[in-house]
Amino acid sequence: MAKIMIDAGHYGNRYNAGVISGYYESNMTWELQGYLKKELEEYGFEVGTTRAAKAEDLEVSQRGLRSLGYDLFISLHSNAASAEAPDYVALFHLVKDDTTKADEVSKMLAKKLAPVIAKTMGTVQEPKVLDRPVDFDRDGD
């Protein structure tokens, strides 16, 4: 069975969306991580998390390195909004200098997940699947 690493976005009480008083992205992603981990484990997946404690502050590169040996890395976030209702879902997949099969699979997975998440959240607009250019020195430059 596949191994999945979940990253609960930010840490502590960080990133208030501004629209809803008392809402912090870090709290939401930490709670969602717990639900998602439990659900995936019930389906038989081996699931790890990048942080053992909500207040643990790790650099992005450290969180990414903790996913070595896993088949899928999911980083949870919720962007600020200008209204109380969710506007749209955005899923990002990585695009590297030397695209591999894994990059294409991540894009396909994002395209399949986006409409399901949007329907569940009841968003106003269609979901967006976006490229996130990254060069973690896979090509050696």
Name what the model sees in each region.
Residues A2-G22:
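Short glycine-rich His-centered loop
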